[in-house]
């Protein structure tokens, strides 16, 4: 496992989380956002809660994800799960960076992030929740859904015909550039796909 993706025993991880997160939001405002990774009503969508003491994180989440406060409970009831994301920037001091951590608990569909402010490690619905979405597609919805690092775009042809394209590639290989070449841009990074009832 790379230094960016370490693995440890759950009990050891929880001890680290308790040690470093206990009281981390003291004197701060804890905010909670209710989001959906995908369209309301779609079988491959994933409801997610983001809990943070950072206005930057919640404001960014409101821009990047579907805020579904009114639809959250019905979606959870229908889909049978939701992802939980807990973050705090702590005191936001350079000396706390060695204590920064991001944990993913795949069994409990929960991510923890603390002592960091970088969007990739605080907007947990992207990286952390994508891991959970992949697990769900692979282990629970095999042959029904896919969660992948893909772009989706549509290119208009003669007579208004739209040819939909989907492409997978690792980071830094041109997904965004490829997706933006289309006339009907859907997404450039993470894709949730499913087979509709009509095939």
Q: Where are the regions that the model predicts?
A:
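Conserved internal helical-beta-strand scaffold that buttresses enzyme catalytic cores
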Residues: 1-173, 183-194, 199
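Hydrophobic positions on the alpha1 helix immediately C-terminal to the Walker A/P-loop
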Residues: 178
């Amino acid at each position: 496992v790379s230094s960016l993706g370490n693995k440890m025993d759950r009990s050891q991880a929880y001890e680290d989380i308790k040690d470093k997160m206990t009281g981390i939001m003291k004197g701060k405002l804890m905010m909670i956002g209710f989001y959906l990774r995908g369209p309301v009503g779609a079988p491959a969508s994933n409801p997610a809660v983001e809990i943070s003491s950072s206005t930057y994180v919640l404001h960014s989440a409101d821009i990047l994800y579907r805020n579904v406060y009114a639809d959250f409970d019905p979606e959870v009831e229908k889909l049978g799960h939701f992802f939980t994301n807990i973050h705090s920037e702590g005191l936001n001091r350079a000396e706390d960076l060695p204590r920064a951590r991001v944990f993913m608990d795949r069994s409990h569909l929960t991510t923890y992030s603390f002592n960091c402010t970088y969007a990739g490690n605080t907007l947990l619905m992207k990286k952390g929740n994508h891991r959970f979405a992949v697990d769900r597609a692979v282990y629970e919805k095999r042959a029904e859904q896919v969660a992948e690092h893909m772009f989706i775009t549509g290119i208009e042809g003669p007579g208004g015909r739209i040819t939909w394209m989907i492409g997978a590639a690792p980071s830094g290989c041109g997904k965004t550039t490829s997706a933006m070449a289309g006339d009907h841009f859907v997404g450039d990074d993470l894709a949730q796909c499913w087979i509709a009832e009509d095939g």
